[in-house]
């Protein structure tokens, strides 16, 4: 048991960065190996580390254990009991004799004992009170961070729609507080903004550098400001938020009209950026399109890196469905994933909801194998909505609502900028999303000539290729119209 664990750690040192070894592997304590059941019991110091190691490293440890014991082994992680448990020492890598590459040195009990390479004496067991205090402290830190450990870079499905956002998020996780500060991610509901910012937080915590992290939804931040005001505790409020190394603010559009909240956030923003501490913000829209937000804040948001997350393309939607089905332990044929992805195009949340509906339908109706017919039956309500005809009238109403103008302005002869652009956008979408000819579209826009429609289509098409903000707006409108 002792020899196996030392060898296991040595092998993991060859595969993982030193920070991950220090943060996640060294704190683990092997408790016992049950030969009859082929179960290896390993203790983690607190619930946060237990959950993280189980999700991210259990497969590697189980593979090494299976190689050592020459049979499949289940690794069972648990929290330490209050009784003391002897700790198997693991000395830093510098004290270890050179180890051959993993492929050249198979694990086997007959190999020379790896523990012989260690000269350090065993560490004394931690006292129960100290262990309990450490667990409590770690849990408190984790609770304060509010991170969801399920949301990582490893299980984030990447495609054209979000590859730039993921690349920026990875860069920030590896080099916080430098060039991309703040990082501002924007896009529609259910496209993965929240997943990405949790992934950044989890990656920084996993690096084991002791960073102080806080994820907070904008509504909760507003609530924190109100409580600080009621309790006359603004000094404590400022001290806490200004002390963070990483602040993740989700859905900042909810700050709209809340002047005191915006003022406090402005002070926190200035203090953190001055100390090269990282701020990451998400929103449903581009910074300059935020309403009810102080211009000073909008200027600060624009000072870093702003990245859009677009609705997922077909291939990405298929990959998301296959990954989700795999995580649920359900084999899904690709043609089934393609069928769902072709008919549901708006966001990741909708896709996952549709998959849950299909799985539940199959389970309740005794359908063992997933196929397209099962999907059609399970999703008939959703499919009837998503297959609805897109009309020019529907486009005009949707665009008018988005730009906050009257539908009648679509037909009028008025040409101020706040009306001309939405009208051209609506003409462009009518050409892209319906079978109407240019003259027919012109008639539906107040009897305009087909050359006017053609000019609008070309103008918006060219602008879309050059302006990220307009491209994002068009994506939002297209997905809204397609359902």
From Swiss-Prot:
Free-text domain note: Domain I is involved in oligomerization and binding regulators, domain II is flexibile and of varying length in different bacteria, domain III forms the AAA+ region, while domain IV binds dsDNA.
Subunit structure: Oligomerizes as a right-handed, spiral filament on DNA at oriC.
Protein name (Swiss-Prot/TrEMBL): Chromosomal replication initiator protein DnaA
Segments of this protein annotated with the region Domain I, interacts with DnaA modulators: 1-71
Pfam families membership: Bac_DnaA, Bac_DnaA_C, DnaA_N
Gene name for this UniProt entry: dnaA
Organism: Bordetella avium (strain 197N)
CDD domains noted in UniProt: AAA, Bac_DnaA_C
Similarity comment: Belongs to the DnaA family.
SMART domains: AAA, Bac_DnaA_C
